[in-house]
């Protein structure tokens, strides 16, 4: 299957090629709180005509309480167990766009399922941008500490090496949400384009040796 290089085609045409090549895989956004996963994910889903799910919202539906309340009542370990159950259930609904919680991709079981059944996209942002964004939601459970900025910095140190294992990394800094969403779509199509060409080259090499 030959695919035009995404740099030379508009988003509307990329949509057709991407959806046909994506098959039943999910586009999964990973990254820290404040990276813009939910907002960007909704825009990507709208552009591609795919269903969008926010795993945190789905967790709250399943628990019938907010994540902040769940943390207070049951603790983080129980939350992570529920997060895994909900995330793996959502992956079965692919193709879709999924915004995951900040700790989801850190879970090896979740990460393996995402890597097998989806294309993972890390939305990366620096400390100041993240803090500016999360300050609008001061009830984030993991930031209920004496020094939220230092806590965020430690989370970055712990999690960024794991987020870096994602298939794609997209900077989520000062660009508009629309621009970041477009960057994601073009990068996904480029990833698929490379994937298809590598597969075709592999088949061609096998044929030569037959």
From Swiss-Prot:
Binding sites annotated in the UniProt record for ATP: 34-39, 140
SUPFAM superfamilies: P-loop containing nucleoside triphosphate hydrolases (SSF52540)
Cofactor remark from the record: Binds 1 Mg(2+) ion per subunit.
Residues that hold Mg(2+) according to the record: 38
Location of the protein in the cell: Cytoplasm
Pfam families, alphabetized: SKI (PF01202)
EC number: 2.7.1.71
UniProt binding sites for substrate: 56, 80, 102, 159
GO biological process: amino acid biosynthetic process; aromatic amino acid family biosynthetic process; chorismate biosynthetic process
First and last residue of the signal peptide: none
Quaternary structure and interacting proteins, as annotated: Monomer.
NCBIfam families xrefs: PRK13946.1
Protein name, as recorded: Shikimate kinase
Organism: Bartonella quintana (strain Toulouse)
